[in-house]
Design a protein with these regions (language model features):
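Phosphate-binding loop/pocket of nucleotide- and phosphate-handling active sites
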Residues: 1-2, 224-296
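A short, basic/flexible loop-to-alpha-helix module at the beginning of a structural domain
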Residues: 1-17, 24, 204
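Glycine-rich adenosine-cofactor-binding loop
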Residues: 13-50
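Glycine-rich phosphate-binding loop and adjoining beta1-alpha1-beta2 segment
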Residues: 43-81
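A structured beta-alpha segment of the ubiquitous adenosine-cofactor-binding alpha/beta core
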Residues: 70-107, 111-120
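ADP-ribose/adenylate-binding Rossmann-like module
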Residues: 107-150
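Oxidoreductase and adenylate-handling cofactor-binding alpha/beta cores
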Residues: 151, 213-232
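A conserved mid-domain beta-alpha-beta active-site/ligand-binding segment of alpha/beta enzyme cores
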Residues: 156-213
Length: 296
């Protein structure tokens, strides 16, 4: 209560958060919101925890390997607040359940995979229809970025990702989203061979620094959005096309309303540092991952 008033605290208690995807950032955001007082959650994730998730997801423990992520997430929230209401969707978000998933939500956290653009599009379209803001966080390197899609504004998820706002979901499912669309920040210390590996289909690498930073940015934006519901507008959320990023490892932070320009500006710096060999080398090429047994 030393940081907000009674109205804000009550709004936090009354808020329902819908979380699509119980990965690193989504999981931490949910747990931290539970600790500040959010009591109602709807969580969707069809996947089970694997060993590889242990580098960034609080829910991964020896005894949770092989268990559904959403169900473990629910149990961890209830361990913080036994009176919390948590609904889980172990089939993930589907066309059949997306309306029910958002039926009581005040805020949606879209932590779905961008390699399935139809899923993120479906979530954001349903949220727009219901007038619900969508929080989007991404982590890259040891940093992260955040933006919010406001249902009352013209800059939509599809527009930001370079997708047709009127295209059917089946058509969007065949699209590939360029990294210049969903990343506004590239760390100058990054090894560009990692970026090339991602473009060739390797999973986006992650660690606890980046995931933790994404969680802090996400929680901060969530609190701003909750406070706006009771008329507290001192801190404005980062509404798209604006994107805010933070990299505690590099000691840099920034905000832009031109995300693609920001991407290419950061990329240019990274290219120069890679050519001059002043970057930090990584082991994420296909050959390096094959030697570790990460790929077939």
């Amino acid at each position: 209560m030393g940081f907000w008033n009674d109205a804000t605290q009550q709004a936090i208690l009354d808020t329902t958060i819908a979380i699509g995807g119980a990965g690193g950032a989504g999981y931490m955001i949910g747990l931290e919101l539970a600790r500040i007082g959010v009591q109602r959650f709807d969580i969707a994730d069809p996947e089970v925890f694997e060993d590889v998730n242990s580098n960034r997801v609080f829910g991964v423990r020896d005894q949770t390997i092989g268990l559904n992520k959403a169900e473990v997430f629910r149990d961890d929230i209830l361990a913080i607040n036994p009176e919390a209401e948590v609904r889980v969707y172990t089939d993930g978000i589907t066309r059949d359940n997306v309306a029910e998933f958002m039926s009581r939500a005040d805020l949606v956290l879209d932590a779905t995979e961008l390699n399935m653009p139809d899923l993120g599009t479906m979530v954001c379209r349903e949220a727009r229809r219901r007038g619900i803001p969508v929080l989007n966080v991404e982590y890259v390197g040891h940093g992260a970025q955040v933006t919010v899609f406001d249902p009352t504004r013209r800059f939509t998820f599809e527009r930001m990702m370079g997708l047709d706002e009127n295209a059917p979901l089946d058509a969007i499912a065949t699209q590939t989203i360029s990294s210049s669309r969903f990343l506004s920040y590239i760390p100058k210390y990054g090894d560009l061979r990692t970026l090339m590996a991602i473009r060739e289909g390797a999973p986006l690498p992650s660690n606890m620094i980046g995931a933790g930073t994404a969680a802090q940015l996400g929680v901060a934006e969530a609190v701003k959005l909750i406070r706006r519901r009771v008329g507290e507008k001192h801190a404005s959320p980062t509404f798209a096309p604006r994107v805010r990023w933070l990299d505690p490892y590099a000691g840099v932070a920034g905000r832009t309303r031109l995300p693609r320009v920001s991407y290419y500006r950061h990329l240019a710096v990274a290219v120069v540092r890679n050519k001059s060999k002043s970057h930090e080398t990584a082991g994420y090429t296909k050959d390096a991952r094959a030697r570790r047994g990460d790929v077939d």
